[in-house]
Regions:
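Histidine/lysine/aspartate-rich catalytic loop segments that bind and position anionic ligands
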Residues: 114-138
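Conserved N-terminal beta1-alpha1 strand-loop-helix module at the mouth
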Residues: 1-88, 92-99, 103-111, 124-131
């Protein structure tokens, strides 16, 4: 198993976002991790598709989009149109996780599943063979 380096856009300087993305483009990072938060599933709000679209135009690294939102399945096609390589959804946010994973794959992306700290890993038993990545929140 290879260790992947995926810096988060949330650590960037939002006043000079393009410079930080260009720095990541020149780095040895494997991916760029984008945390999308809606203020409902999680208490914070980060950014949405206008920012994702702008980032996708200047970033040369594969995009790993992590949705910390309710109903992430509503944004699969829009995320694929950005050219995202990976779409990460929370187990706790998906009513039909297996269907969501299949839809992500059908849209041409890899599918990641994220677990909140209080969620036992055993909940992934039925779908673990279908996911490309598991992200454990801390």
């Amino acid at each position: 198993m290879k260790t992947m380096i995926s810096p988060s856009l949330l650590s960037a300087n939002f006043i000079d976002l393009k410079s930080d993305i260009e720095m990541i483009n020149k780095s040895e990072a494997d991916w760029l991790h984008l945390d999308v938060m809606d203020g409902v599933f999680v208490p914070n709000i980060s950014f949405g598709f206008p920012v994702l679209e702008a980032v996708s135009k200047v970033c040369t690294k594969p995009l790993d989009v992590h949705f910390m939102i309710q109903h992430p399945e509503n944004y699969i096609e829009q995320t694929a149109k950005l050219g995202a390589m990976m779409m990460n959804v929370h187990y706790e946010a998906c009513t039909h996780l297996h269907r969501t994973i299949q839809q992500i794959h059908a849209a041409g992306m890899k599918a990641g599943v994220t677990l909140n700290p209080s969620t036992p890993v055993c909940v992934l038993e039925d779908i673990i063979c279908d996911v490309d990545m598991v992200l454990l929140m801390s």
